[in-house]
Amino acid sequence: MLKKIFIRSSIGLLVATSLLFGYYFYFKYSFVEDLNYRSSVAETALGSIEYSLTGESDLVLLFIHGTPGGHDQTIEPSSYYRVLTPSRPGYLRTPLSVGKSPTEQAKAYKALLDSLGIKEVMILGFSGGGPAAIEFAAAYPETTLGFIALAAISHSEESWQRDDYEDEAFLNGSDFGLWFNFMLLEFLGDEAFVSFMLPNPINQQKLLKDPKQLENLKKTIWSIWPLSIRREGFINDYLQESNLSLHLTDIKVPTLVIHGTDDILVDISQGEAIARLVPNAKMYVVEGGGHMMMSTHSEEIEEAIENFFQKTVDFIGS
């Protein structure tokens, strides 16, 4: 009797495992196919650069994504601007050979613009995309209408140079393990998801009342997966961010710094340094905003970006 139970249990476990892995591989294949479908690859003077371009406006916002990420980690276009989002070197279909340092990556974005025939952009650097956006704004004032630093990294911190076993474990994690954790979070429901993602209870409740922004946060979370096709860029970012020396004081274009008071991933001091060192920079502080404030404070931030964009373009055109 016990032998039969054991055999049936083993068969059941084998079938369940086969179904789970079968679904996982189908999910991963479909996910990557969709990523590729929603992007293009430009052959530039510096190599292949993957990008997405959405919206209809003549004005372009060049969005430089965070760590880790890709062209799928971006923002929605508005009636005022299109959004161009390259996959940074080492992420998705942009090889790391295109540029490792922030300066090299800035040159790559200029090569992308040249390839696409785009003469001017407003550049926005989000989180780990901040260093390359800073270097771009400093090096190409004739191409840069203005610079927006959104929860952006601006300098190295001593803590980043120490061994961080949690980050190391994440860097070495498997696609399946991360997928399983994400699927489990979704299975547990929205309350469990926002509690895990957002430390601030006020932001948790705000997001639970806004299904659209809750969905946007889920998309942002999935923009770090599969890690295997983003890992090379992720590792490079860690190496670069441990020893940053950026040309902040060389930036001469209009600059807006947007940072949240509750950001525990990129401390507000990073944004304050940009506002202090960039001549005539303006700082917009999002009270209670964490690193995911584009979901929890979306209307406030979108309005700040559009107002800055419009005032800058109107000033240049006057």
Could you say what each language-model-derived stretch is?
Residues 251, 257-259, 263:
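Short beta-strand/loop motif that positions the catalytic acidic residue
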Residues 253, 267-276:
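Short alpha-helix in the alpha/beta-hydrolase fold that links the catalytic acid
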Residues 50-93:
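Conserved HGGG/HGGXW glycine-rich cap/lid loop of the alpha/beta-hydrolase fold
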Residues 232, 262-266:
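Acidic catalytic loop of the alpha/beta-hydrolase fold
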Residues 281-318:
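Catalytic active-site module of serine/aspartate enzymes centered on a nucleophile-bearing elbow/loop
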